[in-house]
Amino acid sequence: MVTLKRLLAWISDLRIAIGLLFVIALSSALGTAIPQGELRDSYLEGYSDKPWLGFVNGSMILRLQLDHVYTSSWFLALLAWLGLALILCSWRRQWPALQAALQWIDYQEPRQLSKLAIAETISSPPKNESIDKLAAHLHQQGWQVQQQPGRLAARRGIIGRVGPMLVHLGLVLLMLGAVWGSLGGNRLEQFLAPGRSLDLLNRDGNSHLKLTLTNFGIERDPAGRPEQFRSQLELLEPGQDTAKLHEVSVNHPLRFHGLTVYQADWSLAAITLQLGRSPLLQLPLRTFPELGEQVWGLVLPTNPDGSEPVLLSLTSEAGPVQVFDATGERLASLRPAGPTAEVKGIPIRVVEVLPASGLLLKRDPGVPLVYIGFLITLVGGGLSMIATRQLWAVGDPENECLHVGGLCNRNLTGFANELPSLLASITPASQH
């Protein structure tokens, strides 16, 4: 039993909780520094030649579960430990402190008040007029007063004792919501070209929402850099005949029945070409990381046997489309909806470039719990700033004086400066 009490005391120690917060913050930083949720091979290949921090390679990242920090067993264990520490701290310290603060302490002797942090003695008539005046004045100032013959006890700001418990409760709810969202939520990143649809399935495998991208636009600055992306979406629920229209843009997500759709990225999906008098050909584009961060293109043969291919590359939907041969020599530069250019004897015209919208779809069931926990934490933090003040007064008819003492859990100096004004309100002449 003694060992269990020591263990509980160690777990609920404030220094342990602060240490856990530091470790959790450091772990969260790791999750920010290392890409999360990518394929296993991407870590093995990406960190084989250039280990993170010089020594953390892909195998170590996978073993330590750094590829999914926020759902790793050790990170969840840290959150559980911190939550247990907060619960034990509230149970062992904050709750007894609140119960003690709710109980009235009846000081009956002047010598008891002299041992308090703040103590004053003022002259007083032989009767209890000063105590009556003090009780009435404290009532007017919002104090709770318990008066007995020849003495009184008063307190104010007792609600501040609830603050730390609410902070602990809010943090626990916030962590529960975060864990619930990590384990029970869904996340999908998808590139959609205009006119393409995405069927979202429920747990039973049935479609519960059809999402169609009707239009996608990229707003650019005068230098050609993208500033804003806008996606026009149609959302159709099963059994409904009419789709609902919504727009999603950067920093303006769509929230729909627990699903949040973010405008996360953009890409180039396809290019429409006309070779000579051929029909319009819509060909898919792919990225070329070896040519740059945002370079798309395709390899186009110029002969029926596939020989003498040329590379068409571009960096935006507005072009230009650069044409290179196998030696890297630029053969032509084309613009969407622009004139035809002859490449190796073949007239080539770029009709249009089709951009794709990068959408991030998230379903996080823990978000309401996170918001509630955050709100409770804010309220608890505000209440914790309220000082709990306690005041006692004991009359001394024989010496015609009144002994006053007080306690305060924060800003004791402010309470000490306020006390003389409280006493001056009941008698114009006071002695210290």
Curated annotation (Swiss-Prot):
One of its GO terms (cellular component) is plasma membrane-derived thylakoid membrane. Keywords: Cytochrome c-type biogenesis, Membrane, Thylakoid, Transmembrane, Transmembrane helix. It holds the Pfam family ResB. GO terms for biological process: cytochrome complex assembly. The chain crosses the membrane at residues 14-34, 72-92, 162-182. It is found in: Cellular thylakoid membrane. It is a multi-pass membrane protein. The keyword S-adenosyl-L-methionine does not apply. Signal peptide: none annotated. Belongs to the Ccs1/CcsB family. May interact with CcsA. Required during biogenesis of c-type cytochromes (cytochrome c6 and cytochrome f) at the step of heme attachment. This is Cytochrome c biogenesis protein CcsB. It comes from Prochlorococcus marinus (strain MIT 9303).
